[in-house]
């Protein structure tokens, strides 16, 4: 018993941490027994006081803070405002999520802070208040969920759910809040079901891998240890660091402070020594660890340290520390997701401090030193380029301050600020580690994509629809329901009005005839989907004049059959054209690979099918030299290839063979070395032999001249030119023999004749005599071929040639060009292609390629068809419902019995407008031109003078200036007498644009145009009717601007009045307004038909009534985007919906609904401009930064990932400290003979420590504290194996075999030839399946495989582990009462006794000691005698140490 003067007296409130320290001091001073007695007295005292106080807890004791109501209301108002800004396009999804999370987190934390003052003011003796804030039970976070609000919850993946739980458990949760609560709660339904099973399986694996680890010896005599730097992490408290890391450990080396020994080796570290270390600030301490224990199958006392159950004492011999370690790590697995929802997992930035103004005033600074940006919440801000001087001026005061560089200014120059207003956010000096994360934004409406000029129109990758956004801008989705037309025949044209339930496009059109039937199916390219079926007698070219239907002329390549081939190497399908000519015996067979774009659109000189000519390929690189062959370059698109230096795809030109002849590849050997300083062993312009060493691992395949050239990216090109060197005697005519080809039999310099083709090259090396280098040449002969003359032509009715498909042969390399061979694949030199050809002055611009299946006599074949898209000579008068087919016939066909199949047809159920979107494969992605006729301009008033204004932009009022499409009018000066109209033979007006029915006829209104108008929200029935009768969207009946004119055409006083005409009383003229839509580059584009159309458009439109009172407002233009909540006039309400103006009327506007989306710089768009996207499609990928943390894989999955040694994508967070440790350790081994071995060992040791720290970090981040010794035991087993490297049959090991590290070291001491191995990190599952006990392995996993493998190898299980003995019913070799442990204790005591006697007594004889590396003579039993003795009964055991049997 200690004296009373030394007892400690506490006169303060004791929390949980103080209780732990108090119990630790009691154990250290008085021992476990007396400490337990004191704690029993404290327990009794506590129960007595609780009984006297009669404290109880009821539901009425849960008092909610009265401020919760207005706090929740304020947060909801902020969330509603944020949602509106997101709908307006002011913030994107990530900024919205950040603000939402921080708003609700701040609300939850403020409510938590209000909880304690509320209890103190209203009910200080409240049981909940006393319990939680006294530290006895519960915490503020748990009570906050009872009386405050639950707040934000994370899902099982660690992502925060943006819908907060506003209720608490006292108020009760709604159904939605309960389901969300189940995800992140400690005992939630979802969490319990998943985490319990995972944690149990993790515990089983951990116990399996360390079950045999038992404390067997007192000291393993190791001199190794791990170094702990107490000053490494300055953020942690030094006292907490030393308490967790050092207390209970054993020093691995003497500890010196200023040449004074503070502690000796093998001394345990207690609290007194810790206080000295803290006072002296010892930087580096080496301690013993289970990671450095020399014992192979067990562990020693000193490497383990203190027992965690007996404070201050070393662990006892026989204690199964392995099972304790496995259970200690696995059991808290169910707690790893406990406290996630308490903090809400808030997005935090790297803002260190805020700068606020001291008083009211005006702020001034230099605007040239800042540039604009957006905060992480989407608010406008300015970044300081350098340190910025800011001045705040008021009437009587001036305050100057300096804003550091890279800080955010939240105010503008000359802005009035109030006192304590936040004006800047200063970034932290050391920015935390961040990672870039991608977030996909999905489209929530169906419609058409449009974007601003801030988007790169070219795709990010080749053949991709991903576009990059340079700066912050908007995307617009114009609403509409899409319909993908599987056929090219549309019965309606762009902007046609459709009645309710009107038939749009059928799937089949059947024409029946009684004669020979040939079934033709039109196939979609690449997909081969049936689209149309036609029955007819003969196949030919021409025009269907009978039914006045408009069809396009076509060519069918009947000599080329289309077949589908599957390439197994590439895993792709290819369409091939098989060419067959002549009889079966003399048949010409050739295959062409189709090279047609997905759209099927081809241009002039396009090569749409390619065939490799056999016999014109080479396997080695070289240069091409032309002989007698003559070529011409082919204009048009070339073949893409990747440059070896720049890695950029470029177009390779083609060279058509116009005269046959020969050409010659000159072979050479090429090596590309990509190292910065390659060890090249040959000199430039030197001669080498075959198999000469070029580098350390490259030998030359041929002998010849070496040419070395430095290329881009620090690479070198080494060429070996095969050939011979000839030094001529006379150099006069040498220039004539340079760069020439010598045929066989011709003399060279009148000295010798050539047997084959040779290539002569004059070489002038530096500091040496010039010479002629004679190189071999390979001859390729290109003969004349008759099949090249065969062509397919399309002629008009006047036998004029319109289109021609011909076959050409071309070379891929020009004279003198180098041929590069990559990946040891052959290079084709000559190809044959099918090319389109028409005259340059022809009106044909493009043609369309498709597949046609023709079936005759039960045999079906596919052919390629080339169709004209548009040609003037085939234009005829178009009636309603014109059919646009791909088939063409010239003779008359009897259509006496034809019918339309309406099955599975598409009907329009609403009144709407057909809107053809732009083709996604076109280069110009823009809005179409809405001009259905050829127009001439006349003036609105007969008395007005001729006036030709210039093109002028309309005023706009949209705040989003980046997303405006300007509406303009092109006005040309015409003489009214020059107005003409084209007519055909019957005198009918020709409609050159494909416009079918419901053409809009607007009557000329001579009333004065009202210039000024403004919006109104009034809607009446007449305006809605007028909207339905509008017809062609984009037409306006009168225009507000003097620079816009209605364009109308004179039809020789024969007006075409439509039934939807607005004014039918004036029939003297025919008026058609003309409007242009412009893209962001302010260019107009032609109307482009596409397979995708949008209909039911008016269903997603709304009208805004206009009134023409005085007081001008902002002018609006056609095609202009307007945002929601924008007011055109200050007198009237704001616009209720965002959209695009698609029609203007004097009394109202028609706005097509649209959804704006904000995208920041660096984001990508996943659709082409004008493409139709559906609801749920990926719209944008936003790229943003967030703090690197364990939010992605957190808790139990993170621990499992580390323990299973699974590779992770991200690098270590603490890279800087890791490099410092590596630098400190590796500098010792550099320059040493065994440096590479020491470096591998040091790297493995550092990896062990890093793995322990990462596992510990996951547990500590969620409030679970585990001793490092437990984790080190597991990591020791994960790193205890090594992998043999080479054939070790001589030493008994196979390559790739896993053996114990200590066993490999002992074998290397004995064997003459050392075993080469490398360290390896195994996961706990794999480590459990690679132990010395096959019984333990078979009981864990893969029982059949393990037992079969053990039987084949003849393995022996020595039953050294605990699990093996339990399986066979034996006594486990663990526990302090185990006989083997008792013997071990006796042996340890006798070793100490004999060691002391050794100093005074010498012994004779030499006996090998199996327990030590030194030669000692000891008379005590060996381990073999111990195991034999333990098998006997206890009564027969003689404990006499001198007894020998």
From Swiss-Prot:
Its main location: plastid. CDD domains: RNAP_beta'_C (cd02655). One of its GO terms (cellular component) is mitochondrion. Belongs to the RNA polymerase beta' chain family. RpoC2 subfamily. It comes from the Eukaryota. It is found in: Plastid, Chloroplast. Pfam families: RNA_pol_Rpb1_4 (PF05000), RNA_pol_Rpb1_5 (PF04998). The gene is rpoC2. Its EC number is 2.7.7.6. It catalyses: RNA(n) + a ribonucleoside 5'-triphosphate = RNA(n+1) + diphosphate. Keywords: Chloroplast, DNA-directed RNA polymerase, Metal-binding, Nucleotidyltransferase, Plastid, Transcription, Transferase, Zinc. This is DNA-directed RNA polymerase subunit beta''. The lineage of its organism: Eukaryota, Viridiplantae, Streptophyta, Embryophyta, Anthocerotophyta. In plastids the minimal PEP RNA polymerase catalytic core is composed of four subunits: alpha, beta, beta', and beta''. When a (nuclear-encoded) sigma factor is associated with the core the holoenzyme is formed, which can initiate transcription. SUPFAM superfamilies: beta and beta-prime subunits of DNA dependent RNA-polymerase. Binds 1 Zn(2+) ion per subunit. One of its GO terms (molecular function) is DNA binding. Zn(2+) binds at residues 220, 293, 300, 303. DNA-dependent RNA polymerase catalyzes the transcription of DNA into RNA using the four ribonucleoside triphosphates as substrates. GO terms for biological process: DNA-templated transcription.
